[in-house]
Amino acid sequence: MVRASTAELLRNPSLSIRARSSLASPLYLHSKGLLERPVFYLSEYFESHREEYIDCLNALHQNPTAWEPWLLFFLRAVDEQARENMRRAAAMQRLYKELQTEFPNITNSASCGLLLDAIFESPIFSKPIISGRIHEVNTATIHRMINSLLDAGILHMRTNGAGRRAATYQLRELSLIAQGLPIERFDY
């Protein structure tokens, strides 16, 4: 795989100013060692504050010395998105801990911890994908555990399988938390 440098990405003429600023922020923070990986995306904040975001960019475009409004907006975005990400991470940890106690009762398998870890690594999955990740457990046991979790309502079918295409499943609660949506299990 060929990786473009940060500078190459940001010089790409097909990217809008908006796209460049969305990419530049986490890449810059990563380059300064403030992020382990450049995965702190501000797009969600920018979308929810779209008008102010566009106003700040337009003001900067019209007056290249008008950095203060943009910087204040950007710092507020970092602060609020960081708080939201921390809230979501805490909710994910809480869900994981609760499922650690529920999975053994539902699956009746000592290997359920491996399945839980694999599901948290890939909340949308197929049985073949999960079976390929958990080498310590035979495929029939993995399928039985997944079916038990489906019957219990923990997992949900996302797409039906057809022909050679496997059905996909999801841990809906984890997907909802990742989107910032509430789950019935707990308020966070």
List the model feature ranges, each with a label.
Residues M1-A89:
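Phosphate/pyrophosphate-binding active-site loops
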Residues F74, I130, I142, T168-Y169:
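Hydrophobic, well-ordered secondary-structure elements that form the walls
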Residues N85-M86, P128, G180-P182:
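Short conserved micro-motifs at the rims of enzyme active sites and ligand-binding pockets
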Residues R87-L116:
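Short alpha-helical segments that sit at the start of domains
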Residues S109, M157-F186:
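Short, cationic-aromatic polyanion-contact patches
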Residues L116, E121-I134:
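Short acidic, hydrophobic short linear motifs in intrinsically disordered regions
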Residues E136-S148:
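Short amphipathic alpha-helical interaction segments
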Residues G153:
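Glycine-centered, phosphate/nucleic-acid-interacting loop/turn motifs that mediate DNA/RNA or nucleotide
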